[in-house]
Amino acid sequence: MGKTLVFVNQKGGVGKTTSAINLGAYLALAGKKTLLVDFDPQGNMSSGLGLARGLTVYDLLAGKAHINSVLRTTPVHNLFAIPASIDLSGATVELVDEQDRELYLKKILAEVKDTYDFILIDCPPSLGILTLNGLAAANEVFIPLQCEYFALEGLTLLLQTVKRVQSGLNTALSIGGIFFTMYDTRTKLAQEVVKQVTTYFGDKVFNTIIPRNVKLSEAPSHGLPISSYDAQCAGARSYEKLAREIVARDGQR
């Protein structure tokens, strides 16, 4: 059975979508059949993969399409995607009065979960109904953390939400890991944040740190993961290393 990882942080601009795209690409390149699920109405994952307009995850939630008709190929062999569009924002209203409204995505992905080694869900930067769907559908939570003071405050709130989900919606949910993004070696604050979080969370923190890197910012505008855009840059090497770390940890569980 495949493993579903959800990428969550209620703060925007922390590298969540960039991380989901690039880790998905490197997992696929490592021979792991991988599915990326864009569950953010902004659709940044979809545009970052150069996906054309068409059926989206909203059509699945609305019961207008079957998952096989929404699946897309990507520029990377073994990497597939379910795109999103702004229509998904309507689901937050439409699901409010529905029974089991937090379990819609879980039911959709159940049809294909055994087909993939990894499913990666990119949630919006909020803790609303869409993110709850992502948490309910996942085996593990992955938290990208930018190296700044406010990131620590947000982490506390996020972990409280995860605990609430663990106590009801998804008792099997666990913290897959925390990893640092946009790391700038020149700032003392970045070093201090890494030290504090690592001291508190121990082995939940991945060893690999993603540096601040121009190429990582450029790649989405070309509709490519960093592995296809510039595999030799520091950002690419870091995501490849982090993907290997994820696979290694998965093998130990």
UniProtKB/Swiss-Prot annotation:
GO terms for molecular function: ATP binding; ATP hydrolysis activity. It holds the Pfam family AAA_31. CDD domains: ParAB_family (cd02042). Transmembrane segments: none annotated. InterPro entries: AAA_dom, DNA_Partitioning_ATPase, P-loop_NTPase. The keyword Ubl conjugation does not apply. It comes from the Bacteria. Gene3D superfamilies: P-loop containing nucleotide triphosphate hydrolases (3.40.50.300). The keyword DNA-binding applies. ATP binds at residues 11-18, 211, 213. Mg(2+) binds at residue 17. Keywords: ATP-binding, DNA-binding, Hydrolase, Magnesium, Metal-binding, Nucleotide-binding. Its EC number is 3.6.4.-. It catalyses: ATP + H2O = ADP + phosphate + H(+). Belongs to the ParA family. ATPase probably involved in chromosome partitioning. Cooperatively binds dsDNA, forming nucleoprotein filaments in a strictly ATP-dependent fashion. This is Chromosome-partitioning ATPase Soj. It comes from Treponema pallidum (strain Nichols).
